[in-house]
Amino acid sequence: MKLLRVGTAGAERPALLDAEGVLRDLTGIVDDIDGALLADAAALGRVRAAADAGELPALDATGLRIGPPLARIGKVVCIGLNYHDHARETGAEPPAEPVVFFKAADTVVGPNDTVLVPRGSVKTDWEVELAVVIGRTARYVADDEDPLAYVAGYAVAHDVSEREFQIERGGTWDKGKNCETFNPLGPWLVTADEVADPQDLSLKLWVNGELKQDGTTAEQIFSVAEVVRYVSQFMVLYPGDVINTGTPAGVALGAPEPKPFLRAGDVVELEIAGLGRQRQEFKDA
């Protein structure tokens, strides 16, 4: 299923995109798309049954904003330097263990919402990423368990980053990762049963129509399964938590000088095969 939330910011309603591309209203069946729903197999079953039976009313998508596909996100865990080609382009050694950091849940916005270039920024950068959405509480996932059994679904994430704040201003990466609007998510949450292999997904990103990133999750240093298992050894992952699993080569940071960092007026488009497409205009904060 493709689950999404539509409407004005803060007042989104749950919806489903059916196999014919028709937007369907879920408000008569569920209150919202959130961790509680993803953890409730019976509720998800009712959604699927209603969709299969053609019982869901259609919504007019004309002019309708798409919000983040998930409400009340608990935490956004991020994995840095998780693609072989991205590590090569930045001159970094592939890490021996996953590089873990966080983005605040309030950085999450809709897939087509405006992204704000922070005041004083001269090095705002792009990163297309596969987002993993947790559907079951994952705590110390064992070696003999399948970590993907804890995954509810997948989405497109844009891990927007300010490199000067992140790298040059001291401390941890947090300052360059948590600026407002720095995590567009969606358009949909695609349930895990519709993603045959999360290690076989193409990712692309364009800036002002020019292709900048063209990668595949097959290049990940640590697979989705390895990431879920690893992170669960250090923190509990709850339904509705999100893991951004890293970006492939092609970011501005890895480009020759002068590096083409983002400015107000730029337009970024990104997509992951089967998971949908985003488009953001960048404006000054």
Question: What are these regions, as identified by a protein language model?
Answer:
Residues 2, 74-77, 97-99, 113-115, ...:
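Generic beta-strand structural signal
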Residues 94-111, 124-126, 262-274:
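Structural signature of FAD isoalloxazine-binding scaffolds in flavoprotein oxidoreductases
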